[in-house]
């Protein structure tokens, strides 16, 4: 009898040890998940950034930040599949799918074709793409767009209130909707703040030339501009860096350029950066994951605006002490007015054209 009893104890110990090992192994596999979540509750989410990695001080990094926040708040397991080049887009999306992710998020319009193709081939997987949209969608694909006209208007309001010369500058990469949908509302907002303000507008016809951007900024300052807003990628970063170091107020775009261009305040001129007109990619990614977790994910275009914190002005950072409180209050009031639908921020130019005084070189 004692021999049989000993065998039962060994069996029980082995069973307990096996269960314990399985439990510990599950913790290693998913260190970011809640202990309250059972494996069947966990949702797998993959992020495929654009080339450049998740430390790009841009959309990739913001998307990764939104994913990390979702890991903290929801029962999800995340993975990132960075392509080394554009040639790897399709392969990395396929890797995301084959790993069992229920949602695969891609970043940037360059990945549009690869994302659409993957959505068509994998109808049981949800897909979302940052900063790209289509006219029609399959049932498992979401395009995230951003109300750049709202935050552009807000940036213009600030520019108009801060300008003493009554001349503001705008530098665009190309005369295309993603650029002009920031720039013309910027003008509109500035002229609401001060009807006498005029805008100098120059297109660089190049997104990748910071030296050219700096030259255009200096030219606009020579023509009287004391606030410069650049919507021109690295060309624009060169413009605002030069302008700020020469003593003009500047406004960045897309991301908080206080960190990407001014090194978090370590680069000369940061005190002349008023703000940045941001696309809050982090919030868009977070809310898309939240929809999947809640079972409310829908296909089509997701508009990220001031109301849902999908766009917004970056903090004033080192310039805050130089921005009068009544100006800060006015900008906050205009933001609320836009959210309430009380302020017309300008119809995109391809819908209808308005005539405002522009000085174009």
Language-model features: locations:
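Short, hydrophobic alpha-helical membrane anchors of single-pass surface/secreted proteins
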Residues: 13-17
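Conserved functional hotspot residues at active sites or interaction interfaces
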Residues: 357
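Bacterial N-terminal signal peptides
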Residues: 18-30
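Short, solvent-exposed mixed-charge patches
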Residues: 360-361
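A residue-level marker of the well-folded mature domains of exported/periplasmic proteins
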Residues: 37-350
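Sec/Tat signal peptide C-region and signal peptidase I cleavage site
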Residues: 31-35
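N-terminal secretory signal peptides that target proteins for export/translocation
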Residues: 1-12
């Amino acid at each position: 009898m004692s021999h049989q009893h000993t065998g039962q104890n060994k069996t029980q110990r082995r069973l307990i040890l096996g269960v314990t090992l399985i439990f510990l192994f599950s913790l290693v596999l998913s260190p970011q998940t809640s202990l309250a979540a059972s494996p069947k509750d966990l949702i797998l989410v993959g992020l495929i950034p654009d080339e450049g990695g998740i430390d790009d001080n841009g959309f990739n990094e913001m998307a990764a930040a939104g994913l990390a926040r979702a890991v903290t708040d929801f029962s999800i397991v995340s993975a990132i599949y960075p392509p080394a080049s554009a040639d790897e887009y399709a392969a990395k999306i396929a890797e995301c799918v084959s790993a069992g992710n229920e949602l695969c998020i891609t970043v940037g319009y360059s990945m549009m074709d690869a994302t659409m193709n993957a959505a068509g081939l994998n109808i049981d997987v949800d897909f979302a793409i940052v900063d790209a949209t289509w006219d029609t969608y399959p049932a498992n694909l979401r395009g995230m767009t951003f109300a750049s006209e709202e935050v552009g208007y807000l940036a213009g309001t600030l520019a108009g209130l801060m300008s003493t010369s009554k001349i503001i500058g705008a530098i665009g990469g190309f005369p295309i909707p993603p650029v002009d949908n920031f720039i013309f509302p910027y003008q509109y907002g500035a002229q609401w703040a001060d009807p006498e303000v005029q805008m100098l507008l120059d297109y660089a016809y190049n997104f990748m030339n910071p030296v050219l951007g700096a030259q255009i900024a200096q030219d606009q300052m020579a023509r009287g501009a004391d606030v410069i807003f650049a919507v021109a990628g690295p060309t624009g970063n060169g413009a605002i860096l030069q302008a700020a170091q020469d003593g003009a107020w500047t406004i960045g775009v897309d991301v908080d350029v206080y960190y990407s261009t001014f090194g978090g305040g370590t680069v000369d001129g940061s005190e002349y950066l008023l703000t940045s007109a941001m696309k809050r990619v982090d919030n868009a990614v977070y809310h898309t994951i939240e929809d999947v977790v809640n079972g409310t994910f829908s296909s089509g275009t997701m508009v990220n605006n001031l109301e849902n914190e999908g766009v917004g002005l970056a903090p004033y950072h080192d310039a805050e002490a130089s921005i009068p409180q009544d100006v800060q209050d006015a900008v906050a009031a205009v933001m609320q007015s836009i959210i309430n639908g009380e302020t017309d921020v300008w119809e995109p130019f391809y819908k209808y054209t308005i005539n405002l005084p522009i000085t174009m070189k």
